[in-house]
Amino acid sequence: MMAGVKVEAKNLKKSFGEREILHDVSFDCQPGESVVILGESGMGKSVMMRIVGMLLETTKGSVKIDDQEIVGITERAREKVMRKIGFLFQYSGLFDHLSVWENIMFYDLFIKKKDPHKMKEIAENLMKELGIPEQAIENKPSEISGGMQRRVALARTIVKKPSLILLDEPTTGLDPVICEVINNTINKTRQKTGATMLTITHDLNSALQIGDRIIVLRYGEIIFDGPAFDIFDAKDEYIKSFIKAANVNQKTLKV
């Protein structure tokens, strides 16, 4: 099992022109912790995650991964840090012309030019761990379900053994049963890898299923940061209305 990284973000501000998206945001993720950034669309969740993933520069503030400052980092140092990070984006981004196993092993197979037989064996083992049927190994993405595509994308993410996994709306567009399958797969992945996970979602049920901690973001400001189930004790009226609208049944969720 690999060790997860520590993430520290302090006083983040992000502006696009005159519009400020993040307002002096500070948060952290401890090694191996699963932190969920929860909020409606347009609240700044994706901006926060992209700054942590070095896909977007912050206007002001500091971000450290394992005590290394990544704001203003050199390109060489950036490449080294990026090796620690795995991304699972909202849309799987699988290559339609490649099989399931080729998608999973894309980097090692087509960039590193490693032995195809060994790569296929690694893919088979990972598929088994993530509940991807063996008979799907030669299928193209268009021949499998949306939920299965998410699992294939997750397999592609973790095959490089990242110590920080960033997940962008991993259950968006999936029915409730498949959402639960994906959330269980995410939890098993964290247990197996020990990776730190930072997830953004607007789905409170998913946040409670996969998060140790929940951060609620509203218009670029953090209005809640605490243990996942403590959100039910929050006094903020926006959070109360968010919980009511989500129609959460606590009895069906992990405790």
Predicted features by range, described:
Residues 53:
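Helix-to-loop junction immediately C-terminal to a conserved catalytic motif
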Residues 140-144, 148:
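Conserved ABC ATPase signature
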